[in-house]
Amino acid sequence: NPPETVGNTAGNLNNSGYFCEYDGKVYFANVYDSDTLYSMDPSEQNIKKLGNASVQNILAGGKFLYYYQTGASGDAGIGALRTVRSFNRCKLNGSDVTVLTRDPISTAQLVGSNLYIMTVDDNGPLFYRMKIDKSDKTELANFEINPASAVNGTIYYNGTQDNHYLYAMDTATDGVSTVWNGNLWYPIVQGDYVY
């Protein structure tokens, strides 16, 4: 993917990533079908079911979709306890699903050809980067970093340790800088403004 590729908007991802608009299609978790992955035209025509998994954190870039599978459509009862949760990649038509990780995903974002993943499990939070082919997994932080707001190869996020300042991570170098010493949460950077 080109380095300026971003998988979804911060607004969508900060609201569980149930929608993603990409290349003339809207990909979405259909609430009327157990949050199963669907696509449609922006005019709400040509609706197609793309799989049987319940999904969230939908990302798109290049030839692929990425999503966190939260279960199988219609999971209920004791069977829901065995449901495999995974972060997956598939073609834009929903075919050729590949499991990228079984880590419990809090938020993920696609920047260029890398996935930036925030996971939280019994061992605590972990923020890492891996290539879209599952290679080169690199731990970046052992605290929460929300990668939702990405613009031009930079991830903007709020502090979660000692403050809630606005930070910027350059995805080319993994270098971090402080942008603003204020108090904010779930930043959305658009143009020259931070919301």
Predicted regions and their residues:
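Repeated scaffold domains used in trafficking and secretory/extracellular systems
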Residues: 12-21, 52-62, 102-112, 142-152, ...
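Short loop/turn segments that connect beta-strands within beta-propeller blades
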Residues: 40-45, 91-95, 131-135, 169-174
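Hydrophobic beta-strand positions in blades of beta-propellers and related beta-sheet-rich domains
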Residues: 1, 37-39, 65, 87-89, ...
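N-terminal "mature head" segments of proteins
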Residues: 1-38, 43, 47
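Residue position within the beta-strands of beta-propeller blades
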Residues: 27-29, 66-68, 116-119, 156-158, ...
